[in-house]
Amino acid sequence: MARYRRCRSRSRCRRRRRRCHRRRRRCCRRRRRRRACCRRYRCRRR
């Protein structure tokens, strides 16, 4: 939850939006890292 809160700042998310999106797609494909990665880059959606 702490990470999610930190991600809530828009300016920060906008900067890493591309990087997050790319990594997220790659990670989400694998079941092992899916949870961790998706949670980490969740900021892209909100």
From Swiss-Prot:
Keyword annotations for this protein, in alphabetical order, are: Chromosome, Developmental protein, Differentiation, DNA condensation, DNA-binding, Nucleosome core, Nucleus, Spermatogenesis
Task: Report, as the record phrases it, the tissue specificity of this protein.
Answer: Testis.
* GO molecular-function terms, A-Z: DNA binding
Gene Ontology biological process terms from the UniProt entry: cell differentiation; chromosome condensation; spermatogenesis
**Highest taxon listed in the record's lineage:** Eukaryota
User: Any stretches that span the bilayer, and where are they?
Assistant: none
Taking the first listed entry, what is the main subcellular location of this protein, grouped into a coarse class?
A: nucleus
Q: Which GO terms describe its cellular component?
A: nucleosome; nucleus
Query: Could you tell me where this protein is found in the cell?
Result: Nucleus; Chromosome
Family, as annotated: Belongs to the protamine P1 family.
What's this chain's function?
Answer: Protamines substitute for histones in the chromatin of sperm during the haploid phase of spermatogenesis. They compact sperm DNA into a highly condensed, stable and inactive complex.
- Protein name listed in UniProt: Sperm protamine P1
Q: From which source organism is this entry?
A: Hypsugo savii
Gene name tied to this protein: PRM1
